[in-house]
Amino acid sequence: MKYYSSFGFHDFVICCGYKGHVIKEYFADYYLHRSDVTFDFSAENRMTVHQNVAEPWRVTLVDTGLNTQTGGRVKRVQKYIGDERFMLTYGDGVSDIDLSALLAQHEASGKTVTLTGIQPGGRFGVLDLDESGGTVTGFREKAKEDGGWINGGFMVMEPEIFQYLTDDTCILERTPLESLAIESKLGIYKHNGFWQCMDTQRDRSKLEMLWGSGHAPWMRETV
């Protein structure tokens, strides 16, 4: 969220699932988590917050179910998004992607969805591209490491996407995106910089080490 905010995007809708109440409690007490606080338990029973930590955010937390698939979760928050273009990302990946450039390419392309393509290791499925290299034509699951592009998240979507989302069983990365690829409505923004997901303990250790160094690639000042 801080990374998006550093590009001027401050309105967030979070699709909550497992332990969504913990996320709600975190934001309810956000200023307590981020500030020094004095609790005076004398007769006055007073609490003093020594820093007023403020973010330029508007955050909507939506319970989208425990077992709902990715497409179903997006469908459930449609009423909070309305008919606006929006960005979508997963909660387990970080990058130094230029979000402004991603948005600009999407706007110029006329695609329904533009996803960010990255080239990590070989444990991911890859994307098939057309001759121009700017349109996704299909998906190949669990291919060997061959320099192919994968979906790194960090997507831009037009409200038309909701026409492709059905119910809680809908997997965004399957029928909806595959249908858009067949219709030449799925674009790709190629990112050659830093990208890392956190799927394993090893991934977590790597990211925590980068963060602890004070030079994590995804660190930016909030606008």
Describe the residue ranges of each PLM region:
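Catalytic-core segments of class I nucleotidyltransferases/pyrophosphorylases
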Residues: 85-87, 94-107, 119-122, 135-223
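Conserved N-terminal catalytic core of the sugar/cofactor nucleotidyltransferase
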Residues: 1-90
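Residue-level detector of beta-strand structural context in well-folded domains
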Residues: 125-127
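Residue-level detector of conserved, well-ordered beta-strand and adjacent loop positions
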Residues: 62, 130, 140
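Residues at the starts of beta-strands that form the adenosine-phosphate
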Residues: 10-12, 112-113, 185
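Short acidic-glycine loop/turn motifs at beta-strand connectors
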Residues: 129-135
